[in-house]
Amino acid sequence: MRKRPMCLACLGFMLVLVLLRIAGVPLGTPFSDPKYENKAQQGRKVWIAGTIETYEKKSSNNGYVLRGEGSKGKIYLLAKRGDLPVGAAVRVYGTVKKPESPRNPGMFDEKTYYEGKGCAFYVISEREEVVDAGRWNLGEALRLERERCCAVLKEMMPEEEAGVLSAMLLGERSELTEETYLAYQQSGLLHLISVSGMHLMLLGMALRRLLMALHLPKTSASLAAAAGMVLYGMFIGSGTATVRAVVMFAVRMGAVAVGRTYDSLSALSLAAILMLAENPSYLEQSGFWLSFGAVTAISGVYPVLAGEKAERKRRGEKTGLEKLAAKGKEAAMVYLSLQLVMIPLQAWYFYEIPLFAFLPNLFAGAVMTAVLLTGAAGLLAGLASVKAGSVVLLPTRFLLTLLRQMTAAVAQIPGNVWICGQPEKWQMAGYGIILTGLLVILYVRKRKREMNPDGAKRKGAQARKRERMLFGITMFFACVLLFYRPRETFSITALDVGQGDSLVVESGRFVMLNDGGSSSASAVGEKRILPYLKQRGIAALDAVVVTHPDADHTNGILELLELIGEQKTALRIRHLFLPVWMKGSEKENPFILAAQKAGIMVEYLKKGDEIRAGELTVSVLHPGAGEDYTGEENAGSVVLQLSCGACRALLTGDLEGSGEEEVLGAAERCQILKVAHHGSRNSTSEAFLNRIQPQISLISCAWPGRYGHPHRELLERLRACKSHIYGTPVDGAVTVQLKRDRLAVHGYRSDVEFPVS
């Protein structure tokens, strides 16, 4: 570290930023214009004037960063139009919103995402007007050229291959098909479909060699290549990985120009300092940590694990087979180095890990240079002649087709993706300390061997073999520490799904989903329920219970069934339970078809049925066999009584009216009540509450909502029976855990314990 003061400065700078943010100093927080605060809270539609600074194409719309007129702050504009010029003065009319922090564990962090773009608000535009197109703008010229390049690639290649090459060369992921993106993700190759540091380095070095071949002096060629890559970075968009790669390449070329030795870790540290100084919120961005983590693995971890340099390893190797074996060993060591750093980051940000990523990555590493160079050459040729470009791109098409077939094959392997859950912060810290400590020990021993080669030779290969074995055993236990997930004795989590219901019940290894749907949140299964399950490390649901067929209780479940049937998730569902009165009706058809496609068994619940799992007993109190609730589905909701030790909970769906009267005689006193029908005044009567006497009442609804849930009359009844009320509009996701003889309630704004009585 003494020889790398830039690394020390970077670590110190990051530590200061972390401490300041913990202390509440708003570093990296975008300026929040007061004139938009109230309008955002009310969801009002407004006219906003400003100048467009940047543009990015998205899959379903177009994104612009807008600097407001007469304002210090920026606003992110989501518009259907994709032809608003960068640098233009515009007026837009739409709904202004303030990004929210996630209200469920695992949910997309909208606030952090927009902070990374420097925006405190975003506007969903309905109408745009260009007031002044402005003068010639470099950013707009580069955007138009990038769109032209994407169009040319589409002409020269099939859609899938054109989308992949557009992502690799132009940073344009919007051209990727959903199937391609998913296949690369499940094969551990997601880093390839973006402009990474490796891509930029290959293209930059190729440009430098070309300039030197044209007899440009070494210094001039290096500086020109650096300038070219800066322009290329502006051309493809200044993402985290791009900015980091451009800075590192510029430092490398600068070192060549002045005759100094290039040090990748020092260049990496400089890039981190520059980026964090410009926007400290990068510390909370996944792209920042993944990009810098990958380079740290290659530049810092690999040299230590590899021991001697590759050139020294191959000294004396005569045959081509020996050289091939050495290269294979080197590739395996690079992959191991990457995984040691990237696995905890993948677990932290994505909650799942591809288990069979080695072969696709090995193949990709072997062909990526050829893909990028022939792809770039083909694109340049295609800009002059589509036919000529198509010929040049033939090798690229062939290699990308092979890569696509390999990713598709790997994605089909059962158990390819492991849902591991998100580690705790102490687990991440423990893993990092162990890995760093081992690397320091190996580095010190390596230095001693280099300083005393005769002594190292006497000790021989056995000593190094013992070192590797000790390293492997220690890292195995570090991984056990990282992925340890204690099982819940008993817990119920009411997810915040807006106007809807979704409850996750855990007891030991048993996990049950009771309802899952929303009438106010879109894609609730994919964007709220599934991320929570993955964050918790739940790879399989033993039971999914549909209380009744209303969409605000079921559309998320149907999404999960569809994702499983199309093999778009590693989640598994073992049993799907429907109320017995739905059997043979039209309302069961969507569930039957989706379950059959996903290979899931469908069963029916009636009064008297039980599910037992360890200490947990799930008793069905309603509906009875032979009863028909067609036309009054709420009254026919499945009602479950959960018993675990001395703790009981009652899950009621949308129970009301005649259904509530039937349950009244069978229900017992419960500590936990899931309040029926989102807190409607027509459910959970006074007589019902006197029978149940719940200590804790959970309400799932949207606020403000068109139904006015929870109703004042219902809240008064709950307060009258001295029940503690928790609602998803206030607390976000609410979890009730059984801890020995106490119930602990955890929400975003509550953390309380009650004795079980």
For each feature predicted by the language model, list its residue ranges.
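Hydrophobic alpha-helical transmembrane segments in multi-pass membrane proteins
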Residues: L8-L20, E179-F358, T374, G421-R487, ...
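Membrane-interface helix/helix-cap signal primarily in integral membrane proteins
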Residues: F13-H191, E526-P531, A540, W581, ...
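Aromatic-rich juxtamembrane segments at the membrane interface
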Residues: G116-M248, M253, S337-L340, A543-V545, ...
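Membrane-interface amphipathic/re-entrant loop segments adjacent to transmembrane helices
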Residues: G134-W136, E140, Q186, A347-F363, ...
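Core dinuclear metal-dependent hydrolase active-site scaffold
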Residues: R173, L276-E284, A408-A543, Q596-I672, ...
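Metallo-beta-lactamase
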Residues: L541-D552, W581, L673-H677
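Active-site HxH/HxHxD metal-binding segment of metal-dependent hydrolases
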Residues: A551-Q596, P694
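Cap/insert and terminal regions of metallo-dependent hydrolase folds
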Residues: H575, E660-G732
